C-alpha cells in the first residue's frame, strides 16, 4: 500500500490480496488510516473482487465507490471483470462530486485497464 498526503487530500493506492480474509484484514487497517485525517481520503487500486462480493459490500459501509461499477477492467486484453476501483472515505468525501468516470482504452500498459475519475 502506498499512501501519499497532499495539501488538500490523502491518496492511498493498493493491490489487495486474492483471499477474502486477507482483504478484510487490510480493510481494517485502511479504515484506521482513513479515520486519522480530516482531508478527503481516496483509496484506489486492484481490490481483487467483484462489485456484488461480500468484501465490496463491507467496503461500501465506509467508502463510496467513485468509479463505474459496470465497467470491466480485467484482463486488459478483453476486460470481463470489474476488480479495480477508485473510492473515497465517506466521512471526508461529503462535498465531492463525480464529474466523469471511465475505463481507459489501454490494453498494453498493464494486465488491468486504467480507471479515471474526475471530481469537483
Regions found by a protein language model. Give the residues of each.
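Active-site regions of metal-assisted phosphoester/phosphodiester hydrolases
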Residues: 1-120
Amino acid at each position: 500500500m502506498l499512501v501519499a498526503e497532499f495539501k488538500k487530500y490523502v491518496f492511498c493506492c493498493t493491490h489487495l490480496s486474492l483471499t477474502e480474509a486477507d482483504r478484510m484484514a487490510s480493510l481494517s487497517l485502511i479504515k484506521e488510516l482513513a479515520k486519522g485525517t480530516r482531508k478527503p481520503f481516496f483509496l484506489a487500486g486492484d481490490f481483487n473482487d467483484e462489485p456484488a462480493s461480500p468484501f465490496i459490500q463491507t467496503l461500501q459501509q465506509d467508502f463510496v465507490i467513485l468509479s463505474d461499477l459496470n465497467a470491466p477492467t480485467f484482463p486488459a486484453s478483453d476486460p470481463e471483470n470489474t476488480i479495480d476501483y477508485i473510492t473515497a472515505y465517506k466521512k471526508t468525501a461529503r462535498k465531492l462530486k463525480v464529474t466523469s468516470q471511465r475505463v481507459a482504452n489501454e490494453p498494453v500498459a498493464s494486465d488491468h485497464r486504467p480507471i479515471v475519475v474526475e471530481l469537483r
